A protein has these predicted regions:
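Conserved catalytic submotifs in the C-terminal HATPase_c
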Residues: 1, 19, 24-35, 72
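A conserved beta-strand-to-alpha-helix junction within the catalytic ATP-binding
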Residues: 1-12, 24, 45
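Short helix N-cap motif at coil->helix boundaries in the Bergerat
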Residues: 3, 92-100
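Glycine-rich G1-box
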Residues: 16, 91-92
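Short alpha-helical Gxxx[C/S/T] motif in the catalytic ATP-binding
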Residues: 117, 122, 126
């Protein structure tokens, strides 16, 4: 999987919603060392698209969504830990809701009060996919301040290619 292609596809899919809400949408690959990894492209795209779509949905007009990719060594030859972060300055979540965000049919009461649609299945499905990929998903949030989701996956490197150095 060529990560820049996935990021381009995600930006293309989400740009209409971002534009209609006049949001700022950033993708930061500065700390991404390897562009090519071996993983399930469809599942990775589904996970990231669901998290980013929620960020757009729960971030008000004029808000900001930041997607970052970084890496950490995992101590296994030919593998790396890829860390995907999606951070927004949206409505946020209560600590109580964060404990149940990955349960099926779970929705925050402020969401239902504000009339924001959804079934409460998206994050349960997302966690299930991340688990099947052998990864980890975490959430940090504060009501009224925003939310950050972090997905960490151990990925095999594809051909040991590294990101080209930018000219300084």
């Amino acid at each position: 999987v060529h990560l820049p292609d996935i990021l381009h596809d995600l930006r293309t899919i989400i740009q209409g919603a971002v534009y209609s809400k006049k949001q700022d949408f950033y993708i930061d690959t500065e700390d991404m060392l390897h562009e090519d990894i071996i993983t399930d492209r469809l599942r990775l795209t589904q996970v990231l698209l669901n998290i980013i779509s929620n960020a757009v949905k729960f971030t008000p007009v004029g808000g900001m969504i930041h997607v970052g990719i970084s890496e950490q060594p995992c101590g296994k030859e030919g593998y790396t830990m890829v860390i995907f972060r999606v951070k927004d300055n949206g409505i946020g979540m209560s600590p109580e809701f964060q404990e149940h965000i990955f349960d099926s049919f779970t929705r925050e009461h402020t969401v239902t009060e504000n009339g924001i649609g959804g079934t409460g299945l998206g994050m349960a499905i997302t966690k299930n996919i991340v688990d099947m990929m052998g990864g980890r998903i975490q959430v940090e949030s504060e009501v009224g301040k925003g939310t950050e989701f972090t997905v960490t996956l151990e990925c095999e490197l594809s051909g040991m290619t590294t990101k080209p150095e930018s000219a300084s």
